A protein has these predicted regions:
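Auxiliary Fe-S-binding modules of radical SAM enzymes
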Residues: 1-51, 248-367
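Conserved, mostly hydrophobic/aromatic
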Residues: 35, 62, 90, 128, ...
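Glycine-rich, proline-tolerant flexible connector loops at the mouths of alpha/beta enzymes
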Residues: 47, 78-80, 127-139, 264, ...
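Short, charged low-complexity linear segments at domain edges
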Residues: 54-75
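Canonical Radical SAM [4Fe-4S] cluster-binding loop centered on the CxxxCxxC motif
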Residues: 68-110
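Generic structural signal for well-ordered alpha-helices
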Residues: 78, 115, 142-146, 168, ...
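Core AdoMet radical
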Residues: 97-112, 118-213, 219-223, 229, ...
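Catalytic cores of alpha/beta
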Residues: 164-173, 230-244, 303-313
Length: 367
């Protein structure tokens, strides 16, 4: 595991340890909403209980910022899970190596066939996902999937296990554009309780993944905390700060945030407290106001109604026609979690147009 020279993790953990949600007042919230550019303390105020009565005002400001930087466009993409083998024992995940599920890895022929099916829906952006197993989904295998995807899609993202800089560079050379890594929780103590075995137990290596990806030449990186593992507002604060500091250090990078909540999975649950839609909305609005130019993805974990309401207000990216199992044309392996929005691409497109939004199938040209 590569170690890089970076102080971002120490800075994020220091600020997060001092984040006291109860110290903020309604005056702090209104002051933040009246600022052109927000600082870290303003972010904290928008994630505090004091901001709860101001969700409508936050929504107005968020929508203004979204319109300013993104217009009425919403980017569509879909994930493809190519393998669900995993070497980690994470208590909240269906891919947990000890979970008794049907494991599978797509062959080159399967990948080609499934990508062709996805491309036929009109989508030109794809996100390739694997379980975290270097043995069963090695860097070479991922690279082969990326090369195949390059024949069908104009933008290719990766949501795989953290890699070293040279491995990210290899995948960039294969045709990958951006990398998504969820830190899950930014509380190191809780992190160790949820991640019991495997390479994912190394908190720092995962934390530094976005920096290594950018050093490897990726044009964009995405951040996310799995809301519900820890204190959702504290994790959201840390996640936003993480993205903010990476943006300052790498000003050329395209930054985006994902907002995943815990979902049920095959053979298990987590026993952790849930995160309400109201809390999720507050976090999404705070992200948009704090980093108005960052992308924001709302996944199929959420209901169609919630997703339809949040796009245009603060979310700028939405998945469509989602399958979280292994195999599109023929199911070969079990899902990582349950989804809530099962609409296909055409249904999502029509829903966006009904709202006066512009569905965007491609916002990137490869040269």
């Amino acid at each position: 595991m590569e170690s890089i020279d970076s102080d971002i993790m120490d800075t994020v953990l220091s600020y997060t340890s001092e984040f006291d949600q109860l110290r903020y007042s309604e005056r702090n919230v209104t002051d933040a909403l009246n600022k052109e550019r927000l600082d870290i303390q303003d972010l904290g105020s928008l994630l505090s209980p004091a901001a709860e009565p101001f969700l409508e005002e936050m929504a107005v400001r968020a929508k203004k910022e979204t319109s300013r930087f993104f217009g009425n466009s919403v980017c569509l993409f879909t994930p493809i899970y190519v393998s669900n083998y995993c070497e980690n024992r994470c208590t909240y995940c269906g891919f947990n190596k000890d979970n008794n599920i049907h494991r599978a890895r797509l062959s080159a022929e399967d990948v080609e066939k499934d990508m062709g099916t996805i491309a036929a829906s009109g989508l030109t952006e794809i996100l390739i996902l694997t379980g975290e197993s270097r043995k069963m989904s090695g860097v070479q295998y991922i690279g082969d999937c990326v090369r195949t995807a390059k024949g069908y899609f104009r933008s290719i993202g990766l949501e795989v296990y953290p890699l070293n800089t040279d491995e990210y560079q290899y995948l960039r050379d294969c045709g990958a554009d951006y990398v998504t890594v969820f830190q899950e929780t930014y509380d190191p103590d809780l992190y160790s309780k949820f991640h019991l075995e495997g390479p994912k137990t190394v908190f720092r290596y995962r934390f530094d993944a976005q920096e290594r990806a950018l050093r490897g030449g990726m044009r964009g990186v995405a951040f996310g905390a799995l809301l519900g593992l820890g204190d959702p507002m504290k994790d959201a604060f840390a996640c936003a700060l993480h993205g903010y500091l990476v943006q300052r250090k790498y000003p050329h990078a395209e930054i985006s945030f994902s907002l995943p909540r815990l979902r049920p999975f095959v053979n298990g649950g987590t026993g952790t407290s849930g995160v309400s839609e109201k809390q999720l909305l507050q976090i999404a609005l705070a992200y948009r106001i704090f980093m108005p130019f960052a992308g924001e993805t709302i996944s199929s974990r959420e209901s169609p109604k919630f997703r339809d309401n949040i796009v245009g207000m603060c979310a700028t990216r939405i998945s469509a026609g989602v399958s979280v199992g292994i195999g599109r044309n023929e199911k070969k392996g079990d899902e990582q979690f349950e989804i809530s929005d099962t609409r296909d691409v055409e249904e999502i497109r029509k829903a966006l147009q009904k709202k006066g939004m512009q569905p965007v199938f491609n916002d990137y040209v490869r040269v």
